């Protein structure tokens, strides 16, 4: 998980840019799927302000099939996860993400944002390039409001 030092203006600004960009992507996703928000608890979704920033060396990657929903009680409240996102920070041939049930592969292209359901309907894994490194940011979109989440976080 990325821990942003709020006293470091550069890292704080980078975090905010990423969250704002994903929030804009979420708005577009919901514009294309108007019923999606309506069926969520509280009819609200928000981009979790905690996310992962991962750099994989050549030959490394998350090869295991997985989904992003779980019932653990960690600080990111995974039981509230509705959507997951991946932001590719560089272009890497023969990398990206593959989705099992959809039999679909997304190439790793710098600036590309993927938003997809976090549950078992979208089991996925990373594709690994043996000669180039890959950097991605990944996170989640939860049901509810950011304000409610931050309130719960401050009380824990």
Could you say what each language-model-derived stretch is?
Residues 1-113, 121-156:
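Fe(II)/2-oxoglutarate oxygenase catalytic core
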């Amino acid at each position: 998980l990325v821990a942003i030092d709020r006293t470091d203006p550069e890292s704080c600004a980078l975090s905010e840019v990423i969250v704002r960009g994903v929030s804009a992507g979420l708005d577009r996703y919901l514009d294309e799927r108007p019923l999606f928000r309506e069926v969520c608890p509280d009819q609200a979704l928000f981009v979790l302000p905690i996310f992962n920033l991962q750099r994989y060396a050549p030959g490394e990657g998350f090869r295991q099939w997985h989904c992003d929903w779980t019932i653990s009680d960690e600080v990111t409240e995974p039981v509230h996860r509705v959507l997951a996102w991946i932001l590719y920070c560089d272009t890497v041939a023969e990398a990206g993400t593959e989705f099992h049930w959809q039999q679909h592969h997304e190439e790793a292209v710098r600036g590309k944002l993927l938003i997809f359901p976090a549950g078992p309907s979208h089991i996925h894994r990373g594709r690994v390039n043996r000669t180039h490194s890959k950097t991605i940011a990944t996170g989640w979109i939860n049901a509810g409001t950011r304000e409610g989440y931050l309130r719960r976080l401050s009380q824990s």
